[in-house]
Amino acid sequence: MVVALVGSAIVDLHSRPPWSNNAVRRLGVALRDGVDPPVDCPSYAEVMLWHADLAAEVQDRIEGRSWSASELLVTSRAKSQDTLLAKLRRRPYLQLNTIQDIAGVRIDADLLLGEQTRLAREIADHFGADQPAIHDLRDHPHAGYRAVHVWLRLPAGRVEIQIRTILQSLWANFYELLADAYGRGIRYDERPEQLAAGVVPAQLQELVGVMQDASADLAMHEAEWQHCAEIEYPGQRAMALGEASKNKATVLATTKFRLERAINEAESAGGGG
């Protein structure tokens, strides 16, 4: 039996939380409205602790076995209160008990697109998730964000597993820097006047444009490298993959420089808050 310590209780992935979905829903309503939750609801701290341990347990399960891909960087977290509250207020119809990513696990690895897809399927199969649990955000990225997500709906709760290549991870980390500096609304296509105070709209739009262009460029490179892996003849395939590996290092370095320069120029112009 796989277990995780939650406070003083022992819980496995097949155990349900000690509160009902309806109680968590009411807690979410209270959080969104900025009022004290009903007395029969769990506390926010209890719910977050449960999800933090749930995410950590899934992380341990992933790190504890072998996959088709190697050298995975696996991390986990429970969603912060500020981020969760912003999500509830941005989408008033959303209920706390149905939010998929309160417990989150992230996997970053040096993967080709095909390897990324295969790893997602392996993880979904391992945790008993069906095919619709795999959400591919590569062909239709969200605000430039590209990854493959696996949504787990375990008795113990929901977990979102994000699987990213090193290029997808590089891009996402820079976009997080922008969100921290200019307001997280840029992740949801909000108009500049809705963002953090001190934002220069024209500078922000230029930065977002640079990020969008970089995302498209990285997608093109990854598609080319995947094509190399699909070459029929082994000798040609090995040669093409060798060149792709060299090219990947160059693309990583030039993309990092390009995005760092864009952010630094924006900060120098006074657009960083």
UniProtKB/Swiss-Prot annotation:
Gene3D superfamilies the record matches: Beta Polymerase, domain 2
SMART domains with a match to the protein in the record: RelA_SpoT (SM00954)
GO biological process, one term: guanosine tetraphosphate metabolic process
Family matches, as Pfam families: RelA_SpoT
Descriptive protein name: Uncharacterized protein Mb1401
Organism: Mycobacterium bovis (strain ATCC BAA-935 / AF2122/97)
